[in-house]
């Protein structure tokens, strides 16, 4: 900070009565004020002394005196270049032994500085810096790939990584030299970087100690400093010599210094000046930016709301693209974050100026010519007269354009002043914006909760011991990131597909249809709330056409009332929901049951049922009912009913394909039309669609979906638990929902998977693909005869992450080369297929990447995939709470599966604690939702809830709500509805009791502030359970909601006897466990009160009013 040997105390005239002596702490003999501040927290100490002695004060070191300035107003005076000029004092003066008379260390009056300044400054103009973007991005990608390959559990030393990044960047951009810091063994720093840190630290230490201490006590440190200074200059001279011997045609800094002439004098830089300035840029150009980036990541982690906003801005601007130089200017909030970081933690402690003549400062303090005055950034940048009472707080909003432009002079001076301002400012800001944007675009940051900020002040200010962890976003793996950074260009492709949904017929009221040979046609009917049965229906239609059948219709089951086709086989695909028909079959089932025997003579049918084993009592109930009722009414069964258990360990597509291959089609008469496949043969997709390039369309393939705009997206949980998120939507005008209703969303594949697919088929993001129907095939919801970008096609229409079916595997076997065929064949063995493909959720894309000699075109790939189906979520808001808006509360599904040997290599897997290699998988819909930020849009459709899952009309009756995790969503909506109804209401509201379970009060206790407010006004009483912190006061020792229900048995019983309604929302296991606790208790109460004669809980539930005990269960 000070140059003790350079400056000596001079007498200051105080004969003018208006002048005052500059205050300051009293110095000690010889040592001066050495003990008045903490060298480990120097800038803060200087600020504290300013609070004691005023905005300008003097401190003494041995025989030299320096003046400190801590106010913006006085700093503005010192920045008047007609009165003061920069003084390269303190550590900069010591650094002259290393960098000589470089731009930062030379006096302004030095002719060497003037020539170098005129030659070098134009090299850092805006357009020149833009031209350096690709080199900057190259190094940043190296860092990101290194982080990704270390995995999410590796603590990253932020300062070390930022130093590697900035050193390698400045070297590549200015002299086309690669230090390759990220490739060094064991992550060690490059010796050049180590030497830079050492000489800067030593320069600072020397500048703050008396000469006798440096020369006689610290002689070893002084000797090391001289050796390292000589070594740095030697290495720089070697770089220059190498360029002279091997000239390159590059318009970079080194070539300019070697050949450019000063426009004023016509002189070039001397060999010594070239070394001085090149070394100056290599040192100053990386240390300061490294400090900026390190503190930036610290502040982002300390302020999660800021981190979220920056990440959302990056996502909005960049989207699924790779970052380009044009993106950088569209991130004003990120730029504001960097400005605010520089305000609070400038990389430099400040800078020196000296008066050009004897001066009076602040109207009353005399300073002599050449007297060092030091502007303390840490104080000037926190001046409350400029920044207000919150000047010490990190608030980037103050640095957005309007606020930044209105700052008074000298309120923000991190890059210095006037003619001596840092010429590398555009370079540093472009590099910093790129680095932060790329990191946040690719990673989520994980804070080290144990870290407390410590920083070290030398010539720069750096955080000490600061680490963080990073987690690839969107479920990406390191290989995916690498492919995304270097994906290929566009190419022609071909794809097999079929007519769009719009071209498919609906059922006609004429059951006999036209004169077409009905035996060569089939009709497919489906009923599904989640979309699974609909996807299977279109899969069957495509498979049938592959075998030569025509498709008479693909329609919902309800549309078959009074119009079931006669003559054409009718295939019905449906599911049960708590024993009830899906929405699309609710009218059909009563109609079918009402028919007389023989009414459906001449109808041929087959039924396929979806179900989930957790609903054991009603598993396949509706499909079996339809199957038996059709037979009762005289219809002829052409195949035994097929079923698929859709629990986690089973795949409905594999079950379905097995059924149609082994049961259905062998019983049907196959016409073997053009391109048809004989029964018993596997249908192998062929390249029968022509694909050409064209303009990208915007096509909506479904009815009933409308566009909603995201207005808020935030995390509700802390790291260490599955993430819970909140999403607020702006809805279209006519979208009228009720509390408890559901919304269907149309998700998209993760950018990671889209990039993988694009890379595999060699497609660019904007490659235009047109799928044409050349063989009258049916599609899986693919757009036909319309140009569409490859990104849209692979992102929005087919599920890339869907587990491969056995039929898919056989297709790959047929397309595989000799090297892969045996390995793929082994996976078709039933046990291996289940254990290594199904249970581990291995996708077709996984298999294609693992076995590169599979010759599969896009035309074969697309028909193998299931269409993307909608997913359902409960609204977590009441419609009148914020009119025109709705909120969703959801868990981001992110889980690990064991890596399959031979499929997931080391680059795609990671090792957990016991050494087991695992692959991270993400839920399609929840990952898609988590990628959305404010301003983005999605397509939604309203789905009404069960008429019983709502609050009773009588507000005086009690209600008991039981939920875990995001099962709280509908209850939040009910409570908002109850809160608004209570405003001004005269009627009495019955008690409301909410049992809510989560992992812990500081982990994922959702909407805790809102619920506490409701409790305060008596709207509800919340009984909590924490699985990870049952000892918390409000959990009362309960880990799960079932524990809390047992503990509150008397309270629950009292409300039940008063007519309470019980609403349960959560996973199937939780709902079952709750019934195991409440069922016997409530049954016993009703038995004693004579309200039931049931003997068992099952019997009691069956007889109970459906509105008294209602479950909303999700899988």
From Swiss-Prot:
Molecular function (Gene Ontology), one example: aromatase activity
Pfam families membership: FAD_binding_1, Flavodoxin_1, NAD_binding_1, p450
Cofactor binding remark: Binds 1 FAD.
Cofactor(s) the record lists: FAD; FMN; heme
Region (Disordered): 1-24, 488-515
Residues that, per the record, bind heme: 422
Compositionally biased region (Low complexity): 493-506
Stretches for region Cytochrome P450: 16-494
EC number of this enzyme: 1.14.14.1, 1.6.2.4
Site positions (Important for catalytic activity): 288
UniProt region (NADPH-P-450 reductase), positions on chain: 495-1115
Biased composition (Polar residues): 1-16
The family this protein is said to belong to: In the N-terminal section; belongs to the cytochrome P450 family.
Described purpose of this protein according to its UniProt entry: Bifunctional cytochrome P450/NADPH--P450 reductase; part of the gene cluster that mediates the biosynthesis of fumonisins B1 (FB1), B2 (FB2), B3 (FB3), and B4 (FB4), which are carcinogenic mycotoxins. The biosynthesis starts with the FUM1-catalyzed carbon chain assembly from one molecule of acetyl-CoA, eight molecules of malonyl-CoA, and two molecules of methionine (in S-adenosyl form).
The protein, known as: Bifunctional cytochrome P450/NADPH--P450 reductase
Protein species of origin: Gibberella moniliformis (strain M3125 / FGSC 7600)
Gene that this polypeptide is encoded by: FUM6
């Amino acid at each position: 900070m000070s140059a003790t040997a350079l400056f000596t105390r001079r007498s200051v005239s105080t004969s003018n009565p208006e002048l005052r002596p500059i205050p300051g702490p009293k110095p000690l003999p010889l040592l001066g004020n050495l003990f008045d501040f903490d060298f480990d927290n120097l800038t803060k100490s200087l600020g504290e002394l300013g609070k004691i002695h005023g905005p300008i004060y003097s401190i003494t070191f041995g025989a030299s005196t320096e003046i400190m300035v801590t106010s913006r107003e006085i700093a503005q005076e010192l920045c008047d270049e007609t009165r003061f000029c920069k003084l390269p004092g303190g550590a900069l003066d010591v650094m002259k032994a290393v960098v000589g008379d470089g731009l930062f260390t030379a006096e302004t009056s030095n002719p060497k500085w003037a020539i170098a300044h005129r030659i070098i400054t134009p090299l850092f103009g805006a357009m020149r810096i833009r031209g350096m973007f690709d080199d900057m991005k190259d190094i940043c990608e190296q860092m990101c790939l290194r982080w990704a390959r270390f995995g999410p559990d590796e603590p990253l030393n932020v300062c070390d990584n930022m130093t590697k990044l900035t050193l390698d960047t400045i070297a590549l951009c200015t002299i086309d030299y690669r230090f390759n810091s990220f490739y060094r063994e064991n992550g060690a720093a490059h010796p050049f970087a180590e030497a830079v840190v050492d000489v800067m630290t030593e320069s600072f230490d020397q500048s703050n100690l008396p000469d006798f201490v440096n020369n006689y006590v610290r002689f070893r440190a002084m000797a090391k400093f001289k050796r390292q200074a000589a070594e740095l200059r030697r290495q720089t001279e070697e770089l220059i010599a190498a360029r002279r011997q091997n000239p390159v045609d590059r318009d970079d800094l080194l070539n300019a210094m070697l050949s450019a002439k000063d426009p004023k004098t016509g002189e070039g830089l001397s060999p010594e000046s070239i070394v001085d300035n090149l070394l100056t840029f290599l040192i100053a150009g990386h240390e300061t930016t490294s400090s900026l980036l390190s503190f930036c990541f610290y502040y982002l982690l300390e302020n999660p709301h800021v981190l979220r906003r920056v990440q959302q801005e990056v996502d909005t601007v960049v989207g699924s693209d790779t970052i380009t130089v044009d993106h950088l200017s569209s991130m004003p909030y990120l730029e504001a974050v960097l400005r605010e970081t520089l305000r609070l933690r400038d990389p430099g402690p400040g800078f020196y100026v000296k008066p050009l003549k004897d001066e009076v400062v602040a109207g009353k303090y005399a300073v002599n010519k050449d007297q060092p005055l030091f502007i303390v950034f840490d104080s000037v940048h926190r001046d409350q007269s400029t920044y207000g009472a919150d000047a010490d707080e990190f608030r980037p909003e103050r640095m957005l354009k309007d606020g930044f432009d209105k700052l008074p002079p000298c309120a923000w001076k991190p890059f210095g002043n006037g003619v001596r301002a840092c010429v590398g400012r555009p370079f540093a800001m472009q590099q910093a914006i790129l680095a932060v944007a790329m990191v946040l675009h690719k990673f989520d940051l994980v804070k080290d909760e144990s870290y407390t900020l410590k920083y070290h002040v030398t010539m720069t200010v750096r955080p000490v011991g600061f680490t963080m962890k990073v987690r690839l976003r969107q479920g990406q793996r390191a290989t995916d990131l690498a492919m995304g950074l270097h994906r290929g260009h566009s190419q022609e492709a071909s794809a097999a597909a079929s007519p769009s949904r719009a071209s498919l017929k609906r059922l006609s009221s004429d059951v006999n249809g036209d004169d077409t040979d009905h035996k060569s046609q089939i009709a497919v009917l489906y009923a599904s709330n989640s979309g699974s049965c609909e996807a299977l229906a279109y899969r069957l239609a495509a498979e049938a056409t592959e075998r030569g059948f025509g498709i008479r219709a693909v329609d919902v089951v309800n549309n078959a009332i009074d119009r079931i086709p006669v003559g054409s086989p009718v295939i019905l695909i449906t599911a049960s929901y708590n024993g009830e028909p899906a929405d699309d079959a609710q009218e059909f089932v009563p109609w079918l049951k009402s028919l007389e025997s023989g009414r459906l003579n001449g109808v041929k049918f087959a039924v396929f049922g979806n179900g989930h084993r957790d609903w054991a009592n009603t598993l396949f109930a509706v499909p079996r009912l339809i199957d038996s009722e059709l037979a009762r009414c005289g219809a002829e069964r052409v195949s035994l009913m097929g079923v698929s258990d859709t629990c986690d360990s089973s795949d409905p597509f594999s079950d379905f394909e097995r059924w149609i291959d082994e049961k259905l089609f062998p019983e049907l008469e196959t016409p073997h039309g053009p391109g048809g496949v004989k029964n018993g043969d596997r249908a192998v997709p062929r390249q029968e669609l022509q694909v050409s390039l064209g303009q990208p369309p915007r096509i909506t393939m479904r009815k009933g979906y409308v566009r909603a705009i995201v207005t808020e997206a935030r995390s509700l949980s802390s790291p260490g638990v599955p993430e819970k998120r909140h999403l607020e939507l702006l809805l279209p005008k006519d979208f009228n929902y009720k509390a408890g209703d559901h919304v269907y969303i149309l998700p998209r594949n993760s950018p990671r998977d889209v990039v993988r697919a694009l890379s595999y088929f060699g497609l660019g993001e904007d490659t235009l693909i047109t799928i044409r129907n050349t063989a009258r095939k049916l599609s899986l919801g693919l757009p036909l005869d319309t140009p569409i970008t490859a990104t849209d096609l692979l992102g929005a229409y087919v599920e890339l992450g869907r587990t491969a079916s056995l039929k898919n595997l056989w297709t790959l076997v047929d397309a595989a080369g000799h090297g892969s065929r045996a390995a793929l064949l082994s996976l078709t063995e039933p046990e291996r297929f289940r254990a290594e493909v199904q249970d581990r959720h291995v996708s077709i894309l996984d298999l294609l990447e693992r076995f590169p000699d599979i010759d599969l075109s896009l035309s074969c790939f697309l028909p193998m995939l299931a269409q993307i189906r909608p997913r359902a979520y409960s609204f977590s808001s009441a419609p009148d709470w914020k009119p025109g808006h709705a909120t969703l509360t959801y868990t981001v599904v992110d889980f690990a599966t064991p890596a399959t040997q031979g499929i997931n290599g080391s680059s795609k897997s990671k090792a957990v604690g016991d050494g087991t290699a695992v692959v991270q998988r993400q839920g399609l819909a929840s990952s898609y939702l988590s990628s959305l930020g404010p301003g983005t849009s999605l397509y939604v459709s309203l789905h009404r809830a069960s008429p019983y899952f709502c609050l009773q009309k009588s507000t005086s009756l009690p209600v008991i709500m039981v939920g875990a995790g995001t099962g709280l969503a509908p209850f939040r909506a009910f409570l908002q509805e109850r809160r608004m109804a209570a405003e001004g209401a005269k009627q009495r509201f019955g008690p409301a009791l909410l049992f809510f379970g989560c992992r812990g009060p500081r982990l994922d206790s959702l909407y805790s502030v809102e619920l506490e407010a409701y409790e305060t006004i008596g709207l509800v009483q919340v009984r909590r359970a924490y699985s990870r912190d049952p000892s918390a006061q409000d959990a009362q020792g309960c880990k799960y909601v079932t524990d809390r229900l047992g503990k509150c048995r008397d309270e629950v019983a009292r409300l039940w006897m008063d007519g309470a309604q019980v609403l349960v929302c959560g996973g199937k296991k939780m709902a079952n466990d709750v019934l195991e606790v409440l069922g016997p208790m409530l049954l016993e109460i009703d038995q004693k009160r004579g309200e039931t004669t049931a003997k068992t809980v099952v019997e009691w539930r069956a007889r109970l009013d459906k509105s008294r005990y209602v479950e909303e269960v999700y899988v």
